[in-house]
């Protein structure tokens, strides 16, 4: 297990050689709880620093469980279309090239699992099950307060359908089960046992259960992307705070946990930066990228 180091202990800025600074060519960022603060905003100093490192030739990647409509506005704020950045949406099930809008990788759930998963989920009290079109969130049971949190984060309307599986006539990158944490804690292992080898099922937040195509997580898709670019994991810094960031933090040459990260994420990281409300990403840039 990697041993985390606090920002106060590991004062690296004046210790890194120029060669070490140039080692890292890629910066990959989770969004909620990492790039954005508690107001879901990118602070001006962090935005300026991220644009600066792109101008200097670094590749910026945004990697999120959000749908593409929830990622793209932040990519535009960071001017990623100018500098060759990439967006990993749906926890890596879709990779989009910012400069062209081209989808260069896309994985969908097997359609025949949608109805049985839906039927299992609907037996749980108070939960919802949702997926996404390009413009809206589709609710299969009826929105709960966690559904509305997801809608607010992504600025998307919610439409409830009477027959969720029948309504999904298009490729589905992921389904999300919003619900009370204690309900999801019981549901998750049940679904994992039923769909072992078919689906990737995990919680991104205590109140969000992600249902993904087999083997899809942020690390898997980053590996595909880096390989296509002729780069390695050792050349990448990954920053995150949640359960769904674990794979990429363990995969990266430098895995960084936010001070506000889940405990298991901090335990897996090489370095712990400041919180998302204290410009933690700016701190990483100052220490390791300039």
Question: Where are each of the predicted segments found?
Answer:
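Cationic, low-complexity basic patches in intrinsically disordered or flexible, solvent-exposed regions
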Residues: 3-4
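Asp-based phosphoryl-transfer active-site loop
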Residues: 25-38
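Mg2+-dependent phosphoryl-transfer enzymes with acidic/Ser/Thr/Gly-rich catalytic loops
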Residues: 22-26, 43, 210-290
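Short, Lys/Arg-enriched N-terminal segments with co-localized hydrophobic residues
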Residues: 9-21
């Amino acid at each position: 297990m990697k041993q985390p180091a606090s920002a106060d202990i590991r004062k690296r800025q004046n210790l890194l050689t120029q060669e070490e600074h140039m080692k890292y060519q890629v910066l990959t960022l989770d969004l909620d709880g990492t790039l954005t603060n508690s107001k879901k905003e990118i602070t001006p100093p962090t935005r300026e620093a991220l644009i600066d490192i792109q101008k200097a030739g670094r590749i910026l990647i945004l990697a999120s469980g959000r749908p593409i409509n929830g990622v793209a506005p932040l990519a535009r704020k960071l001017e990623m279309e100018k500098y060759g950045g990439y967006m990993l949406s749906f926890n890596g099930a879709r990779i989009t090239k910012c400069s062209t809008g081209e989808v260069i990788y896309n994985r969908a759930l097997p359609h025949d699992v949608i109805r049985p998963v839906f039927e299992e989920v609907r037996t749980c009290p108070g939960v919802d099950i949702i997926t996404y079109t390009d413009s809206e969130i589709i609710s299969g049971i009826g929105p709960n307060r966690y559904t509305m949190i997801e809608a607010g984060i992504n600025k998307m309307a919610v439409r409830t359908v009477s027959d969720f599986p029948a309504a999904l006539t298009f490729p589905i990158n992921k389904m999300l089960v919003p619900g009370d944490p204690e309900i999801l804690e019981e549901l998750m292992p049940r679904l994992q046992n039923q769909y072992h080898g078919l689906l990737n099922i995990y919680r991104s937040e205590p109140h969000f259960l992600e249902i993904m195509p087999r083997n899809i997580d942020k690390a898997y898709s980053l590996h595909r992307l880096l390989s296509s670019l002729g780069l390695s994991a050792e050349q990448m810094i990954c920053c995150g705070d949640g359960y769904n960031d674990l794979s990429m933090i363990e995969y990266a040459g430098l895995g960084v946990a936010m001070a506000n990260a889940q405990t298991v994420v901090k335990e897996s990281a090489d370095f712990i930066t400041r919180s998302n409300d204290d410009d933690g990403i700016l701190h990483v840039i100052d220490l390791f990228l300039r």
